[in-house]
Amino acid sequence: EAVVPDLLDFFAATIYEQDFKHTHLGKGWTASASAKLGIPALQRMRRPAIEALKASKRFDPPMAINHVAELAKPFLSIGNQYGEGWFLAGEMAELITSGTPNIVCIQPFACLPNHVVGKGVIKELRHRYPGSNIVAIDYDPGASEVNQLNRIKLMLSTANKNLAKQNAPEQKDQAAG
């Protein structure tokens, strides 16, 4: 089943970064104020959807942006803000910790964050979360479609092998019992 991160989290990350810019990068006090007021305002706006997702049996609510930032901090500084920066690492850690270890990190147009941040933190994510299965794929005019599809198939093959390993002890217990 495909799990797609929440689009509003991208905007929340942009707002969240403003306090760091004020504290560490010399941006004016209005940047910090926009973060301190903007994040709670966005949370209030999202509250009905989050409550509905909490009540659902099939969907999970999005993680609070400050929690996503905490998940990213072992990998990158919040000061890493170009492109998606720290947020890309935080999103991948969020997916893994919430039970989605198989990730296809897709970036269009040879996007610099995927090359620098995405591919750079994938090794450390795999180290910290041993069951994770992550592949980074670029979709741009120069990319080979066959290569893209083969990388996705390889990721799915690894996911199926990992699932079989997880189910093997359960099947063994059922056969013994």
Identify the meaning behind each predicted range.
Residues 1-177:
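An N-terminal assembly and electron-transfer interface module characteristic of large anaerobic redox
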